[in-house]
Regions:
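An acidic, low-aromatic, low-complexity terminal/linker signal
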Residues: 1-157
Length: 157
């Protein structure tokens, strides 16, 4: 069965989220910092009266050399709105869900629940992230320090 995904980039990684959850994409939205919030939460974004956490995807996935300041992907995940802060936006791609390669079983912590798998593309891998897991982790952060979170693993092609 084909399903559409919004493709985006964080550092050197190509990631995707289900297009049906997409509300809009914006450039350079500012958010209000919240004292004491974890590093992955950039702050609270007010988009036309809708308040939502602004999640720094580079910090969330521990991807170095990425500022995630260029684009905000606004999503409706179940009953919650979230904003993913990313480096750049790609296309919306229709992919066959049967071609999804499951992630390695040795992933742990938030990566085990966040990475749903990957699609093989001609240009490399598209890593599919679970937006429901990101939303849960953003709203019920377990207090992980940056040092306790492993970096995003390299999936072999």
């Amino acid at each position: 069965m084909e399903r559409s995904f919004l493709v985006f980039h964080v550092g050197t990684y190509t990631l995707g989220v289900p297009a049906e959850e997409l509300i809009e994409v914006n450039r350079n939205l500012s958010c209000t910092k919240v004292p004491g919030s974890p590093k992955m939460i950039r702050g609270i974004l007010n988009l036309r009266g809708l308040l939502m956490p602004a999640i720094d995807m580079a910090a969330y996935l521990n991807i170095p050399h990425s500022a995630c300041e260029s684009f905000s992907i606004i999503l409706k995940v179940q009953e919650n709105n979230i904003a993913l802060m990313v480096d750049s936006i790609g296309d919306i791609m229709a992919l066959n869900e049967q071609e999804l390669v499951l992630p390695p079983t040795h992933l742990s912590g938030q990566f085990q629940e966040t990475i749903q798998g990957a699609f093989k593309l001609s240009s490399g891998l598209l890593i599919l992230v679970d937006t429901a897991a990101i939303s849960r982790n953003a709203q019920h952060h377990h207090g992980h320090s940056q040092d306790q979170i492993p970096s995003l693993p390299i999936l072999s092609e």
